[in-house]
């Protein structure tokens, strides 16, 4: 059996989760590194998954209006399409003659609202479609994700390797397409990119945002869709990991129920501030600011591993 987690450790790890979840530096890698370097034990994949519920709750609150609008547009448009498909057919010669509407302020507002509704409907589908790959792979490789994928040699390597991917995306990405031009192909590519985040050190936001940049999306559009895309996957992962987190077994730090709750609340509060800051940051700055940090951190961890200061497992 592992050691019991202290309240200080729970607070620190909740803070780390909130600070790093939305930055392209991998929150799972930071929880793995901080718990091992400073506390001598791995907090575990289940602890990571459950505290991510706090940061995803922050996304739900921050994007509440967007999410509600997408849900309403998706359900109502789907219902309208279903009714139109099953309704009575009107012969062409019996259909009323349509006239081009007179362009007025009211019409412009209505057209804009319809365009927004169509976009929200499409984004709803894109999130659903893009979530399928990580759902399948996460289920098939759940044991490997909780064990071998948390090896610090692999984590440090992925921190460095994906730093280069992010830098390449910033350099070669056209960054011309707004979120209104998002397509099914974009959603699928970003969905498969999200699967890479199953490996600590990659970063969910880093993987999906980089994919969006390679596809030519504007940086802010790529990051915004990245946040929306993470909601179903991270929420499902956290709920799936709840039983293991509350009944820990084996090596590592074991958190109690109250400690998990406090860590999750801390991650929510800090995560909300983090997502608000990042969206403002990417509107004016590139993701290259995080590249150097990832490389330095990866090299430091490799150095500590090579010197025998910390254990890889």
From Swiss-Prot:
Subcellular location, principal: membrane
Catalytic activity entry: di-trans,octa-cis-undecaprenyl diphosphate + H2O = di-trans,octa-cis-undecaprenyl phosphate + phosphate + H(+)
GO cellular component, as recorded: plasma membrane
One GO BP: regulation of cell shape
Keywords: Antibiotic resistance, Cell membrane, Cell shape, Cell wall biogenesis/degradation, Hydrolase, Membrane, Peptidoglycan synthesis, Transmembrane, Transmembrane helix
Top-rank lineage group of the source organism: Bacteria
Molecular function in Gene Ontology: undecaprenyl-diphosphatase activity
Entry EC number(s): 3.6.1.27
Residues annotated as transmembrane: 121-141, 152-172, 187-207, 225-245, 259-279, 290-310
Compartments in which it is found: Cell membrane
Membrane topology: Multi-pass membrane protein
Record's keyword annotation contains Protein transport: no
Family under the similarity heading: Belongs to the UppP family.
The protein's role, per its UniProt record: Catalyzes the dephosphorylation of undecaprenyl diphosphate (UPP). Confers resistance to bacitracin.
NCBIfam families documented for this protein: PRK00281.2-1
Note from the entry: Bacitracin is thought to be involved in the inhibition of peptidoglycan synthesis by sequestering undecaprenyl diphosphate, thereby reducing the pool of lipid carrier available.
Annotated protein name in UniProt: Undecaprenyl-diphosphatase
Organism expressing this protein natively: Nocardia farcinica (strain IFM 10152)
